[in-house]
């Protein structure tokens, strides 16, 4: 049973729609995404949040939690990560993501990756198999737009290429289409990637004024229609479903 001191935790609210278990390896994130909700959620400033560091004793704490979950015959995958990116630039130095995957696997736990790290994440493809999932967040297809909203994340093409290579290796793939910044671009992402993506999860844009410029009813209708037409496996988050 997980406790308040556990680093593997059961997300609440909107995050629970993406994964029932998660672990955050780093405090903060170096991708500096303009729309990121994590600083507010963690009650810290963006300046502090954008100076990431490994969480203290994180691997040892994962071992404690993973051992407990194995004894309980846990079947749910553990997501890396919600409040940071597992393959942000400093992971090249610390390689916590690789070590965390190895620990989780040693206790028969599956992993679900969510990243904007692009090629950095491919380092660990040799570890992913079976019921593991590799996923990326995609908000746009234009490099200049990406540099505006996600200045230090991998560019969109690099993320898409990493998805394709994961698919070629037989790894289950998924895309988080959240936040939605430009609905027509989100639809185009689906058209360009559906042949090598096993699941799409689609949300909205929360806690940002740009959200008011989007016709959410139209987007919800259009994206559901497209995903159905292409026979994709998909999940629409509650924030989007309410617009249907």
Segment roles from a protein language model:
Residues 55, 85, 241:
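Short, glycine-/Ser/Thr-/acidic-enriched flexible segments
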Residues 1-77:
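N-terminal [4Fe-4S]-dependent radical SAM core
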Residues 58-227:
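Conserved AdoMet/S-adenosylmethionine-binding subsite of the radical SAM
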Residues 115, 179, 230-244:
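Acidic carboxylate-rich catalytic motifs and surrounding loops in phosphoryl-/glycosyl-chemistry enzymes
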């Amino acid at each position: 049973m997980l406790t308040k001191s556990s680093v593997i935790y059961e997300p609440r609210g909107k995050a629970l729609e993406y994964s029932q278990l998660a672990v955050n390896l780093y405090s903060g994130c170096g991708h500096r995404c303009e729309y990121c909700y994590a600083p507010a959620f963690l009650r810290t400033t963006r300046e502090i949040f954008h100076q990431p560091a490994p969480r203290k004793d994180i691997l040892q704490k994962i071992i404690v939690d993973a051992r407990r979950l194995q004894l309980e015959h846990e079947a749910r995958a553990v997501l890396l990560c919600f409040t940071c990116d597992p393959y942000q630039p400093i992971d090249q130095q610390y390689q916590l993501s690789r070590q965390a995957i190895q620990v989780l696997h040693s206790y028969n736990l599956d992993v679900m990756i969510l990243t904007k790290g692009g090629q950095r994440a491919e380092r660990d493809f040799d570890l992913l198999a079976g019921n593991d999932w590799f996923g990326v967040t995609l908000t746009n297809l234009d490099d200049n737009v990406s540099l505006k909203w996600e200045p230090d994340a991998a560019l969109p093409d690099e993320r898409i290429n990493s998805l394709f290579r994961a698919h070629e290796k037989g790894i289950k793939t998924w895309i988080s289409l959240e936040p939605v910044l430009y609905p027509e671009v989100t639809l185009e992402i689906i058209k360009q990637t559906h042949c090598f993506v096993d699941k799409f999860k689609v949300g909205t844009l929360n806690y940002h004024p740009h959200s008011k410029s989007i016709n959410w009813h139209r987007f919800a209708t259009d994206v559901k229609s497209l995903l159905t037409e292409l026979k994709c496996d998909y999940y629409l988050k509650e924030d989007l479903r309410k617009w249907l």
